[in-house]
Amino acid sequence: MKYFTIFVFVFSLCMLGHVSGAGIRIVNELKNKKTLWMRCYSKNDVLGPTVIPNGGQFTDYFFHNLFGTTRFMCTLKQGPGFSHSQSFRAFKNSGLWDWRAREDGIYLRRIYKAKFDDGADNLHKEQSWI
């Protein structure tokens, strides 16, 4: 019975992380049909590199680890010459991290739902281009 209780406890923690959702979305909202180069990585995974067309997006859902220490770092570069760039922590702990690349910077909206939506509420500038 003791092992069953431990199993149920660990299983519940895993399911809680799954239900709450974890993910990154990067949306290209740059002007003048500019493309957006992106590459993200964690301790265990690499996303990209890929080029996101103007108006396009890159979305990745994943499981964060049991201890809540999952981190993703991302680098974004504005096309066509990719001379403006920024590297930043794109995910920490939990939730859905919705990033929007715009001419004046990179904006973030954190969502605590199961999936991304098209809303723009609570969007704030988090990074400036270098």
Swiss-Prot record:
Swiss-Prot/TrEMBL keywords: Secreted, Self-incompatibility, Signal
Cleaved signal peptide residues: 1-21
The protein's name in its UniProt record: S-protein homolog 32
Family per record: Belongs to the plant self-incompatibility (S1) protein family.
Cellular location(s): Secreted
GO biological process entries: rejection of self pollen
Keyword Transmembrane: no
The organism's taxonomic lineage, starting at the top: Eukaryota, Viridiplantae, Streptophyta, Embryophyta, Tracheophyta
Record gene name: SPH32
Species, as recorded: Arabidopsis thaliana (Mouse-ear cress)
